[in-house]
Amino acid sequence: MAVEKVNSSSSLAEVIDRILDKGIVIDAWVRVSLVGIELLSIEARIVIASVETYLRYAEAVGLTSQAAVPSAA
């Protein structure tokens, strides 16, 4: 996949359309500690994409298989 460089300005709608088409993943990790004692730890992975894009890439890495779905029991 080649990176395309465009020198023209983009409208907000074009930027949102491109993000939904290609998708974006944000990994966040926060740890709050006081005097060496961990008080709070937060890990998050945020995926922003259209449903079609998410399903296309999730299927490629095996996230849509039945094994990836947690059981209700």
UniProtKB/Swiss-Prot annotation:
Q: Which PROSITE patterns match?
A: GAS_VESICLE_A_1, GAS_VESICLE_A_2
List the keywords (alphabetical): Gas vesicle
Give me the Gene Ontology terms describing cellular component: gas vesicle shell; vesicle membrane
One example GO MF annotation: structural molecule activity
Encoding gene per record: gvpA
Membership in a protein family: Belongs to the gas vesicle GvpA family.
* Disulfide bond sites: none
Localization recorded for this chain is:
Gas vesicle shell
Q: What is this protein called?
A: Gas vesicle protein A
Keyword hit for Transit peptide? no
Q: Which InterPro entries match?
A: Gas-vesicle_GvpA-like (IPR000638), Gas_vesicle_GvpA (IPR047870), GvpA (IPR050530), GvpA-like_CS (IPR018493)
State what this protein does. Answer: Gas vesicles are hollow, gas filled proteinaceous nanostructures found in some microorganisms. During planktonic growth they allow positioning of the organism at a favorable depth for light or nutrient acquisition. GvpA forms the protein shell.
KW Transcription regulation (keyword) present: no
On assembly, the entry states: The gas vesicle shell is 2 nm thick and consists of a single layer of this protein. It forms helical ribs nearly perpendicular to the long axis of the vesicle.
